[in-house]
């Protein structure tokens, strides 16, 4: 049985597999990478590094949507 960890995704607590990457979570929860910036523990993540970031218990992930205006 895989060990589980808890993360907070856009303000909601989620239980995920311990060895999950940020990329896995983006795919599982269908976050549109083309339209958002990803923040991990209050820091913007370089999209080139998303596949190599392993998540830890209590990590906080936010998808920040771009809004046009003028």
Where are these regions (language model features)?
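Ubiquitin-like/PB1-type beta-grasp interaction modules and other compact soluble beta-rich domains
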Residues: 1-69
């Amino acid at each position: 049985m895989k060990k589980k960890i808890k993360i907070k995704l856009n303000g909601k607590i989620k239980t995920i597999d311990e060895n999950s990457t940020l990329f896995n979570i983006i795919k599982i929860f269908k976050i549109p990478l083309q339209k958002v910036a990803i923040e991990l523990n209050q820091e913007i993540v370089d999209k080139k590094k998303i596949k190599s970031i392993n998540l830890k218990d209590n990590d906080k992930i936010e998808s920040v949507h771009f809004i046009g205006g003028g």
